């Protein structure tokens, strides 16, 4: 039996709560996770009525496989042959990219919050961060984000603009810092993880266990991880 996600707030499934729910919904839809009999009846009724997202982290689950089947799956999944094939599989690469992007967005949110600026959402900021992650590690992108948010705060103090307008400049400053670094081939000091944003279980599974790189999804660029033997 798998206990409700909300019972273990320190053990994050993915880098953000919205993605947690997306993962759980996918596993339920694919009949990999089954609702445990210990789950309250009204929660399951809400799911049937397409009104379940707010309660999904309160559910208990059972895995729809026997222990031996799970052991065999783990053995196959962690074999060198499987990992080698996964490194070339688009779906696997997309998951790796998604984890790194979500970690970067979470840090951007946290950093803007420190400066009392609203979180910037949208395709544009995601595109900028993805461009950064093509070359740099998440720990280095943290550096771009930190200084980008700091520049946003300074811009807000200098100009008669509202906070949302100032926060929207984050993508401009992050992009500018990245382009300057690439143009002049500057060293980017990697940052440490912050206490409030620990490595997620999904990141640990993919990068530490499957790719055999301790917190590699944070410490190393993805292209480097996928090209290593």
Each language-model region and where it sits:
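Basic, alpha-helical nucleic-acid-binding regions used in initiation and control of genome expression
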Residues: 1-229
